[in-house]
């Protein structure tokens, strides 16, 4: 009996104190930021990589984006069949990664609009894909449409029926006065009228991206990311153009002044072409939220056998099979991301994660370049 007990205890001891593989030098040691150093936000963000959980994923995302921004063709050896221009060291140094930025409309409703405007203003991204709300919400907030009110902070728990009686629309904990859309109609309908005239007189065939570019020109407002996209010749694609207030405007306009044509086929050629003809550049994807912008950017990059960098920031899960929640590895299976790509998904509200990521990547890089001038 005593021998049996001894064997049981020995077995339990062996189970409890199983010998470990030595991880020293193989894995990052978990440690957080020491505030005894003082408050240094850059070092705080850098510490996220060793913090664990989603802080580490955000730290990894910062690293991936910095790789994306630092890459140049000079990092690669010239291929045998490249052109003479591509052999020139100065040319190779000038060739940078093409950055695709995708985001859902709620982020333009939020203060992330100003972060996105900063990136577009300074031409830090090359291609944008968003939803219809990501177009109209930017225009509605434009200061040049002086009669329009801003979006306001509310509460997630405000009763829908009560808000409806007051003409207030809720987006999470944001409130948008319905008058905004009434005044948006007053602003946009004359522009659609003019576009129809030009379609007839100048034989212009409008596409969603051309329409969006025109609206960016018309808003003429430095607080608008669409204004800067127009000014910097950055294409903004919106394949679901009719799914929002802008679609409502097109619907009502089709009765008041029928005939305007918006061709989506030209735009699918254009957005896919942005990826297909990116070579010899690498491509990187930064996608906030899921749905249409996420898939549209990934699918375009499939046409070139996958993007080289990918950062997804969203709170969706993969277990219902939705594309929104799919991790980068699923996109690799479709050829939308290269098998050798640097990728990460940050499971986090983009209103928290994205400004922090921009602070330690795009903005930090620009500030460093500005100080070195």
Swiss-Prot record:
Top-level taxon = Eukaryota
User: Which residues are recorded as binding spermidine?
Assistant: 136-137, 248, 295, 321-323, 330-336
State a single Gene Ontology molecular function.
deoxyhypusine synthase activity
Which cofactors, if any, are listed as required?
Answer: NAD(+)
Alphabetized UniProt keyword annotations: Hypusine biosynthesis, NAD, Transferase
Catalysed conversion reaction: [eIF5A protein]-L-lysine + spermidine = [eIF5A protein]-deoxyhypusine + propane-1,3-diamine
Q: In which pathway does it act?
A: Protein modification; eIF5A hypusination
Q: Where along this sequence does the record place binding of NAD(+)?
A: 105-109, 131-133, 137, 243, 290, 315-316, 349-350
Which positions are catalytic residues? Answer: 336 (nucleophile)
Pfam families for this protein: DS
Task: Identify the EC number(s).
Answer: 2.5.1.46
User: What does the UniProt record say this protein does?
Assistant: Catalyzes the NAD-dependent oxidative cleavage of spermidine and the subsequent transfer of the butylamine moiety of spermidine to the epsilon-amino group of a specific lysine residue of the eIF-5A precursor protein to form the intermediate deoxyhypusine residue. Also able to produce homospermidine from putrescine.
Name the chain's protein.
Deoxyhypusine synthase
Encoding gene (name): DHS
């Amino acid at each position: 009996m005593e021998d049996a007990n001894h064997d049981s205890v020995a077995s339990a001891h062996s189970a409890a104190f199983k010998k470990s593989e030595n991880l020293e030098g193989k894995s990052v040691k978990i440690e957080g930021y020491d505030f005894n150093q003082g408050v240094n936000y850059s070092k705080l963000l850098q510490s996220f990589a060793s913090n664990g959980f989603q802080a580490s994923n955000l730290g990894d995302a910062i690293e991936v984006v910095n790789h994306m921004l630092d890459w140049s063709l000079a990092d690669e050896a010239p291929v045998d069949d490249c052109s003479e221009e591509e052999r020139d060291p100065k040319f190779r140094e000038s060739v940078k990664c093409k950055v695709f930025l995708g985001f859902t409309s709620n982020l333009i409703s939020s203060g992330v609009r100003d972060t996105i405007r900063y990136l577009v203003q300074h031409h830090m991204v090359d291609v944008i894909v968003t939803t219809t709300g990501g177009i109209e919400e930017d225009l509605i907030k434009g200061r040049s449409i002086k009669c329009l009110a801003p979006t306001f902070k509310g509460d997630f728990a405000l009763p829908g029926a009560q808000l409806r009686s007051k003409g207030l629309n809720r987006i999470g904990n944001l409130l948008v006065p319905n008058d905004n859309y009434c005044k948006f109609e007053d602003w946009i309908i004359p522009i659609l009228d003019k576009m129809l005239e030009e379609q007839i007189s100048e034989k212009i065939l409008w596409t969603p991206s051309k329409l969006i570019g025109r609206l960016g020109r018309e808003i003429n407002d430095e607080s608008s990311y669409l204004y800067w996209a127009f000014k910097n010749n950055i294409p903004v694609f919106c394949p679901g153009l009719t799914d929002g207030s802008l679609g409502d405007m097109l619907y009502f306009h089709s009765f008041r002044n029928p005939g305007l044509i918006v061709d989506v086929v030209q735009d699918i050629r254009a957005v896919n072409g942005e990826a297909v003809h990116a070579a010899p550049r690498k491509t990187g994807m930064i996608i906030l939220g899921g749905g249409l912008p996420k898939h549209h950017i990934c699918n375009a990059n499939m046409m070139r056998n996958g993007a080289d960098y990918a950062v997804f920031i969203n709170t969706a899960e993969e277990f219902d099979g939705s594309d929104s929640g799919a991790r980068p590895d699923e996109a690799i299976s479709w050829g939308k991301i290269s098998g050798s790509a640097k990728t990460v998904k940050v499971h986090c509200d983009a209103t928290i994660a994205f400004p922090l990521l921009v602070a330690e990547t795009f903005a930090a890089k620009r500030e460093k370049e500005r100080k070195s001038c």
